[in-house]
Amino acid sequence: MSERKPPYLRSALDSIPPYRPGRKVVGPDGRSAKLSSNESPFGPLPSVRQAIADAAADLNRYPDPAAAELTAALARRFHVPEEHVALGAGSVGLLQQLLEATAEPGAEVVYAWRSFEAYPLLTGLAGATPIHVPLREETHDLEALAAAVTDRTRMVFVCNPNNPTGTAVRETELAEFLDTVPEHVLVVLDEAYREYVQDPRVPDGVQLYRDRPNVAVLRTFSKAYGLAALRVGFLIGHPQVVDAVRKTLVPFAVNHLAQAAAVASLAAEQELLERVAVTVKERERVRAALLADGWTVPETEANFVWLRLGEDTLDFAAACEQAGIAVRPFAGEGVRVSIGLPDDNDAFLTVARTYPKRN
């Protein structure tokens, strides 16, 4: 009997590592603080939970593939035409849709590094070539990013605020960068953490896109809105880009519960922003405590802080884990720590204070 041959699979997959999400740990005293995934520490508001419960009565029906109610609500909220709004299963889903619409073998996708770790994974899956541009002082080097654009570049990602460093580029420099990128190259402003931004110099991408047809903005309901489990994000861009993104959406990918919860969240936005203010206050408290204790922590406009630890990264993460605190290590580089509830933040600060080294 001849040896069975395995099914043919794309060779491009051989070099792509699996995405590793933040995990949960439990300490010896039973503490389990998950500060590894940049999730909101707050559950959905009562009105949002009620909307989910009401929508559950129709789970035997397919969701609206056009998500018309949510699309209209987003258009009203951001003062854009409905044909400028596209939806996806979280901003990661939209990133994949964008790559399917623009990338092909031989094409290049440019982004800062380190940045959102899904960028190289999704770029590789699309068969395109990822181009990493090193950060400068933990933030985007926009001049180097512009210089990396070639005639093979199809898309540029700008994560603002940047994940995992939390740093943000300012309006003047970002606008200048956008105006240097060739018109045929799509620039995607990934603003997953926009709601946490307090610095007025950090631009709202929705304002920058309006007179730039090659700029699109990504947002998500997973972070500040607290709907990470439901996977719903949106893109705001010009019709040619939006039409392409809509075509690459897997049918019914944005489920019925997600649509209902997102609409209800927009209606309760003021209450949600009050929760954001609590997280921002905790963010500033945590960073100030770390700085006072001798740590180097870049300014952050997101819901996390970044500690560049180099070769001590995994050791520090292990010390946190032993205390029942999950953080997100990037081996050889640093640790990202999400802002949680005050008690969990205090537990993390205790580990940081007792750790024998500083960065």
Curated annotation (Swiss-Prot):
Protein keywords: Aminotransferase, Pyridoxal phosphate, Transferase
Entry cofactors: pyridoxal 5'-phosphate
Assembly, per entry: Homodimer.
Gene: pat
N6-(pyridoxal phosphate)lysine: residues bearing it: 223
Transmembrane segments: none
Annotated region described as Disordered, given as residue ranges: 1-42
Record-given protein name: Aromatic amino acid aminotransferase
Catalytic activity, EC: 2.6.1.57
PROSITE patterns for the chain: AA_TRANSFER_CLASS_2
Function according to Swiss-Prot or TrEMBL: Aminotransferase that catalyzes the conversion of aromatic amino acids and 2-oxoglutarate into corresponding aromatic oxo acids and L-glutamate.
GO MF annotations in UniProt: aromatic-amino-acid transaminase activity; histidinol-phosphate transaminase activity; pyridoxal phosphate binding
Similarity-based family: Belongs to the class-II pyridoxal-phosphate-dependent aminotransferase family.
GO biological process, one term: L-histidine biosynthetic process
Pfam families named among the record's database cross-references: Aminotran_1_2 (PF00155)
Source superkingdom: Bacteria
Reaction(s) this enzyme catalyzes, per UniProt: an aromatic L-alpha-amino acid + 2-oxoglutarate = an aromatic oxo-acid + L-glutamate
